[in-house]
């Protein structure tokens, strides 16, 4: 929506001002800082990951492009107003979803579809998602994408969690 367009415009302006090489330096430094902060927060909750998966690799490794290709080959995409749409309503969603915007940039949903494909192509038996309760609408959307890709929906497990107040040693933990 409008937020994505605004962010895209900010990124384009930063690239214009910095140039590609300096933009990459700033981008990578910011990325590493954010990941370190996330890892630190998770560690504070007693959660340590063996590995992180880079969303960027979905594009560089071709998962998004392959997922869109599969949906296209299966007849589940159409063009409207310059954008590429997924026929999500064919699989029970309340509306069709854009996967490639008019400007040729794939949407976050397209990345989610690519990630789903990558999970199974990398040999995982199932995909487990944990969403905040405010993302409940994503369940039907993601399962629709799985069906469009020809994947077994039973191999996808989605849990919803509700926001809560956390305490450690009787003290409330600041969440943000």
What are these regions (language model features)?
Residues 1-176:
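NTP-dependent nucleotidyl-transfer catalytic core
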């Amino acid at each position: 929506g409008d937020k994505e367009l605004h962010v895209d415009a900010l990124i384009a302006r930063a690239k214009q001002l910095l140039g590609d090489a300096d933009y990459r330096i700033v981008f990578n430094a910011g990325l590493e800082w954010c990941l370190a902060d996330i890892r630190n927060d998770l560690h504070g909750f007693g959660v340590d990951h063996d590995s992180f998966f880079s969303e960027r690799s979905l594009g560089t490794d071709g998962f998004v492009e392959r997922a869109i290709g599969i949906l296209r080959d299966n007849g589940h995409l159409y063009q409207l107003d310059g954008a590429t749409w997924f026929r999500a309503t064919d699989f029970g969603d309340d509306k069709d979803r854009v996967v490639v915007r008019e400007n040729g940039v794939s949407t976050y949903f397209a990345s989610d579809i690519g990630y789903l494909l990558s999970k199974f192509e990398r040999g995982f038996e199932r995909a487990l998602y944990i969403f905040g309760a405010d993302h409940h609408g994503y369940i039907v959307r993601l399962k629709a994408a799985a069906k469009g890709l020809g994947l077994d929906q039973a191999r996808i497990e989605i849990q919803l969690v509700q926001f809560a107040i956390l305490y450690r040693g009787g003290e409330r933990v600041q969440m943000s």
